[in-house]
Structures are given as C-alpha cells and as structure tokens.
C-alpha cells in the first residue's frame, strides 16, 4: 500500500513539473527564414574588436560580479571588454541577462564582429531556459525553430 501511495505521489509531482516547464525554442512558430541547420552553419567564433580588459571576477567564475563588470565596461563604451565579460557570465555562470546583452551586441556589431546567426543562437538558448523576450527576439531575427 505504501508503494502505491508513493507511486501516486511521484506521478502527481512529476505531472506538476511537466506543466510548469518553460516553453522551449522548439515551440516557436515556423514563420521565420532560418532553419536550425542554416543557423548552425552561420555561427562563428567570437572575434573581439580592440583590446580587452579582463576581470578577476570573470576569471574566477563569479557570474554576478562578472556581469556587473560587463555593465560597467559597456557604459564606458569599452565594448570589447564588455562582450568578453558578458560571454564569461553567460557561458560560465548561466547569467541569462548577460546572454541577452551579448546577443544584442552581436546584432549591432558592438565590440564583436556583427553576426546575426550568433545573436539568434544566443537568443534561442536563452529562450529555451524560459526568457520570453529572448523568444520574441529570436523570431524577430527570423529563426523558425
């Protein structure tokens, strides 16, 4: 009897988890211009424009402090340093607002080589983790995933 109750409780718990899961980029409408394969073909390694100031916070994996450093560098118009720090906060610590900012920088070519495919990919990944604005931006740029 205890096993049956435990199984029912686990089933109810898992059903609740599934219904609250974030919507993924896979659920995006198929109205865009680019397929996933086309997107992956267009992604290029990050090429920074100018010299980079690095932060100890970013080197040590402190995502929140790294994002603060990136915001500071961005406000000083040191876009290469900001892009490098946003990348560290996004990739290393999963600070998704940093991913959004880096995607925007790829879109505009601020501190990095302008690359719409890199921007779409960052928006797509951030959308997968439940950031609705990222989903909207990804669709605006033409991703049909």
Give short role names for the model-derived ranges.
Residues 17-34:
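Bacterial Sec signal peptide processing site at the extreme N-terminus
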Residues 46, 59-63, 73, 92-95, ...:
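Short helix-capping/linker turns of helical repeat alpha-solenoids
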Residues 66-75, 85, 101-108, 140-144:
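Hydrophobic face of amphipathic alpha-helices that form TPR/SEL1-like repeat modules
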Residues 1-17:
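Sec-dependent bacterial lipoprotein signal peptides
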